[in-house]
């Protein structure tokens, strides 16, 4: 399979280039960065593109890829419901093209989201803390937002988190994502980390995941690349590729 990388000079993108080049069953075609023409992907007969760019350009990238029949594995953040709907509309005209967008490709992070969803209905309270390097463009992270939504879905019909806070500084209790408080930390020295804290009478449960190096994303991305043709249309997350019940 012939694979190109968008954002190839970024920290994650460069890691993806190295990962593709090291895979015996994949052929690296080209790396594209800001200012480079996307047409190079067509010229090199690229079949699948890995996109780790920026929310400001990812939609233009996807429009080009879909129109040219190139599958996409996307780790870029900033996808709203409206953006996802637009991607689905573009894909209607290209039913054989596959796009997979994931908030996190680290296997441990995906498992932690799954475990949090399973635990959610068994605890009275839950909050999410995500911690990242200070160069991250979005807050909360896509992983934290998705985690919160999965938890909220699992807690449907349950009372909201007990919280007697009546006064305080704006934002002190975090962002509200479908009723789940999410707190964002940006700190030099961090890569990508998340804690989900559950509490109920007499006990707490903490589910934590740490990506200490960007190579943690490579196995999940390459899994998505290898499976991309099997799921035409838009797929969110890599959970379905991991056979999580």
Swiss-Prot record:
Q: What is the lineage of its organism?
A: Bacteria, Bacillati, Actinomycetota, Actinomycetes, Mycobacteriales
What PANTHER family is this protein classified in?
4-HYDROXY-TETRAHYDRODIPICOLINATE REDUCTASE 1, CHLOROPLASTIC-RELATED, DIHYDRODIPICOLINATE REDUCTASE
User: Which residues bind NAD(+) per the record?
Assistant: 7-12, 75-77, 102-105
Annotated coiled-coil positions are none
Q: What Enzyme Commission number(s) appear in the record?
A: 1.17.1.8
Q: What's the family?
A: Belongs to the DapB family.
Q: In which pathway does it act?
A: Amino-acid biosynthesis; L-lysine biosynthesis via DAP pathway; (S)-tetrahydrodipicolinate from L-aspartate: step 4/4
Q: Which GO terms describe its molecular function?
A: 4-hydroxy-tetrahydrodipicolinate reductase; NAD binding; NADP binding; oxidoreductase activity, acting on CH or CH2 groups, NAD or NADP as acceptor
Question: Is NADP one of the keywords?
Answer: yes
Q: What's any one GO cellular component for it?
A: cytosol
Q: Where does (S)-2,3,4,5-tetrahydrodipicolinate bind?
A: 133, 142-143
**One GO term (biological process):** lysine biosynthetic process via diaminopimelate
List the catalysed reactions: (S)-2,3,4,5-tetrahydrodipicolinate + NAD(+) + H2O = (2S,4S)-4-hydroxy-2,3,4,5-tetrahydrodipicolinate + NADH + H(+); (S)-2,3,4,5-tetrahydrodipicolinate + NADP(+) + H2O = (2S,4S)-4-hydroxy-2,3,4,5-tetrahydrodipicolinate + NADPH + H(+)
CDD domains recorded: DHDPR_N
Q: Which Gene3D superfamilies match?
A: Dihydrodipicolinate Reductase, domain 2 (3.30.360.10), NAD(P)-binding Rossmann-like Domain (3.40.50.720)
Any idea where this protein resides? Cytoplasm
Summarize the protein's role: Catalyzes the conversion of 4-hydroxy-tetrahydrodipicolinate (HTPA) to tetrahydrodipicolinate.
Sorted keywords for this record are: Amino-acid biosynthesis, Cytoplasm, Diaminopimelate biosynthesis, Lysine biosynthesis, NAD, NADP, Oxidoreductase
Write down what this protein is called: 4-hydroxy-tetrahydrodipicolinate reductase
The organism of origin for this protein: Mycolicibacterium gilvum (strain PYR-GCK)
């Amino acid at each position: 399979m012939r694979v190109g990388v968008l954002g190839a000079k970024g920290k994650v993108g460069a890691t993806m280039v190295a990962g593709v080049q090291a895979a015996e069953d994949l052929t690296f075609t080209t790396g594209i960065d800001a200012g480079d023409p996307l047409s190079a992907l067509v010229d090199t007969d690229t079949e699948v593109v890995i996109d780790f760019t920026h929310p400001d350009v990812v939609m233009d990238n996807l429009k080009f890829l879909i129109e040219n029949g190139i599958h996409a594995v996307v780790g870029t953040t900033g996808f709203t419901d409206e953006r996802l709907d637009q991607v689905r509309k573009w894909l209607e005209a290209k039913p054989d093209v596959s796009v997979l967008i994931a908030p996190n490709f680290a296997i441990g992070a995906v498992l932690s989201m799954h475990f949090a969803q399973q635990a959610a209905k068994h605890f009275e309270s839950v909050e999410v803390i995500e911690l990242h390097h200070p160069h991250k463009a979005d807050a909360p992270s896509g992983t934290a937002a998705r985690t919160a939504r999965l938890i909220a879905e699992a807690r449907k019909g349950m009372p909201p988190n007990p919280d007697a806070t009546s006064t305080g500084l704006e934002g002190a209790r975090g962002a509200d994502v479908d009723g789940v408080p999410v707190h964002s930390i940006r700190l030099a020295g961090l890569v990508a980390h998340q804690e989900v804290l559950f509490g109920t009478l007499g006990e707490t449960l903490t589910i934590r995941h740490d990506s200490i190096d960007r190579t943690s994303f490579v196995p999940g991305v390459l899994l998505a690349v290898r499976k991309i043709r099997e799921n035409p249309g838009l797929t969110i997350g890599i959970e379905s590729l991991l056979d999580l019940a």
